[in-house]
Design a protein with these regions (language model features):
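N- or domain-start disorder-to-order transition segments that initiate the globular core
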Residues: 1-8
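Non-heme Fe(II)/2-oxoglutarate
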Residues: 9-99
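A short coil-to-beta-strand element that immediately follows conserved catalytic motifs
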Residues: 103-112, 147
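Conserved short histidine dyad/triad with adjacent acidic residue
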Residues: 114-127
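Catalytic core of Fe(II)/2-oxoglutarate
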Residues: 126-131, 139-142, 147-245
């Protein structure tokens, strides 16, 4: 399902830190299946400020830290179960090792999917030291960058220091190799946007690291994500924007 031939060292940039854009990861049919069945079950609201960044979005576990099976697999479509199986495969880890030059086989993996609805965002930050490398996939079939919700590669902690903006379109993905300078953010989703920004973060941790998304003893209530405008409403909104530009 994932085109692992695209995982080559040449895909990584050295500026402003080690990161890379990898596109065209799925065939049209697989991409359509993943977009059409993006998970809505077992989400929790993630919101706060941790001393470095502010954040607000909805998150669901796809693969728990160090697990060998998908989370809540009975609620996943066939396409999403296949994707989870590929992420758990030795072939995917080998491709990540080839891409980054790091030994992904010895790292602990966690995978979460997210909906970013209106006003959702993730402020400028560098990842925690426990995170070695993160691979972010996107699952929107269309997206207006004016609606925000785009991963922003930064050259410093200031949101204005933009190096690259990546829209969350199906087949797009970004690899971030953690460093003291690996600043990035997700721009706020515009309040008038009713199509969630959909992503999946595959994070490789140092062995023995705890999950910050799902800490031990976490009792946060889970819910079905319902913050979505009906298809006709989305179409009408797009037509209105085209008319008013």
């Amino acid at each position: 399902m994932i085109d692992l031939t695209r995982f080559t060292p040449e895909a990584l940039s050295a500026e402003p830190y080690r990161w890379g854009f990898i596109g065209g990861l799925f065939s049209p049919s697989d991409g359509e299946a993943l977009v059409g069945s993006f998970p809505r079950d077992h989400f929790k609201t993630v919101k706060g400020y941790d001393g470095e960044k502010g954040y607000q979005y909805e998150a669901r576990s796809l693969i728990r830290m160090g697990a060998e099976v998908a989370s809540h697999a009975e609620h996943l479509s066939d396409a999403w179960r296949r994707l989870a199986e590929e992420l758990l495969s030795p072939a995917y880890r080998a491709a990540m090792s080839r891409l980054t030059g790091l030994d992904a086989a010895g790292l602990t993996m966690e995978v979460n999917v997210s909906h970013y609805g209106p006003k959702a965002w993730l402020g400028p930050h560098v990842d925690l030291e426990d995170k070695v490398v993160t691979h972010v996939f996107y699952f929107n079939d269309a997206w207006d960058v004016e609606d925000g919700g785009c991963l922003t590669i930064l050259s410093s902690s200031e949101m204005s220091k933009v190096v690259k903006v990546i829209p969350p379109l199906i087949g797009n993905s970004v690899v971030l190799v953690r460093s003291a300078h690996s600043w990035h953010a997700v721009s706020p989703v515009r309040d008038s946007c009713r199509t969630s920004r959909r992503s999946m973060a595959v994070t490789f941790y140092r062995p023995g690291s705890p999950s910050t998304m799902w800490p031990e003893g976490d009792k946060t209530p889970l819910h079905t994500y319902a913050g979505e405008r009906p298809p006709f409403g989305r179409w009408l909104q797009q037509k209105w924007r085209q008319f008013t530009r």
